[in-house]
Regions:
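Single conserved hydrophobic/aromatic residue that forms the stacking wall/gate
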Residues: 1-14
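A generic helix-loop boundary/linker signal
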Residues: 2-3, 57, 198
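A generic structural signal for short, non-catalytic loop/turn and secondary-structure boundary residues
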Residues: 5, 81-82, 151, 184-186, ...
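A residue-level signal for beta-strand positions that form part of recognition/binding surfaces
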Residues: 9, 85-86, 188
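Hydrophobic helix-and-loop "lid/oligomerization" segment in the mid-to-C-terminal part
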Residues: 15-166, 170
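A contiguous loop/helix-start segment that scaffolds small-molecule binding in enzyme catalytic cores
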Residues: 175-232
Length: 232
């Protein structure tokens, strides 16, 4: 990456391309790139990974559009007279991108998300949560419904028999209608500090980058710039 550029951005871009192959097919080409012995070989597999990543981006956008259409019809509406406090969507999504869909919807609507792919005989689900909810402990309350289950407080994945999906949906809607009864979804942006625009310089960028790697448990710092106008 160029001097002064964000290490987080660089890591994300590289990771997206390495992960895209495994999401849509298998990760062999990613491994071949990492094991390349010369620039010609590396360029060959880098182009393949870039194609996979573009395909992943297109499929992800299409799938999120489909999921949001479903939200408009059902998931954000009243269910059995109660406000629904969870996004729960099933469909013929590619299993490799259901986590990306769940992340996007949780980020947008500030609600726990469960996205289930029903492409195979055993359905696969991916969940993303909000700070108020320990999603893995919540799912463990209904452990008998799953074939397999794993994760952590912020995200989880599972496999489930199709006939158990309606039961899971009913149980989760009931659970969250009680546990999040007073929760009002909002896309609140939390900032770590106010900053003057004059503080945006190479020295401070390097200091921030020295705190990486960023991710769950070590989020990238968020700064507030007041009275700043952005022109296109």
């Amino acid at each position: 990456a160029k001097q002064g550029s964000s290490s987080a951005a660089s890591v994300v871009l590289k990771r997206q391309r390495l992960n895209a192959t495994g999401r849509l097919a298998d990760a062999t080409d990613s491994l071949r790139l990492l094991c390349s012995q010369n620039s010609l070989q590396a360029s060959k597999y880098a182009r393949i990974l870039e194609d996979h990543n573009q395909n992943r981006q297109e499929l992800q956008k299409e799938s999120i559009d489909v999921a949001e259409e479903s939200l408009g019809r059902d998931a954000i509406n009243h269910v059995s007279g109660q406000n629904n406090k969870i996004i729960f969507i099933t469909g013929s999504f590619n299993p490799g991108i259901i986590g990306l869909i769940a992340s996007r919807l949780t980020q947008k609507y500030a609600l726990p998300s469960v996205i289930i792919s029903t492409q195979d005989n055993i359905a696969r689900g991916s969940c993303r949560s909000i700070p108020e909810v320990d999603i893995i402990n919540t799912l463990r309350k209904f452990n008998d419904l799953f074939v397999d289950l794993g994760g952590h407080p912020g995200a989880a994945g599972f496999s489930i028999l199709p006939q158990n999906i309606p039961k899971l949906k009913k149980q989760l809607i009931k659970h969250f209608s009680l546990s999040l009864d007073n929760y009002l979804p909002s896309n609140t942006i939390f900032v770590d500090a106010r900053m003057d625009i004059s503080a945006v310089n190479l020295k401070n960028i390097k200091l921030i980058n020295s705190l990486s790697r960023f991710g769950i448990g070590n989020q990238e710092p968020q700064f507030l710039f007041e009275t700043v106008k952005i022109d296109n």
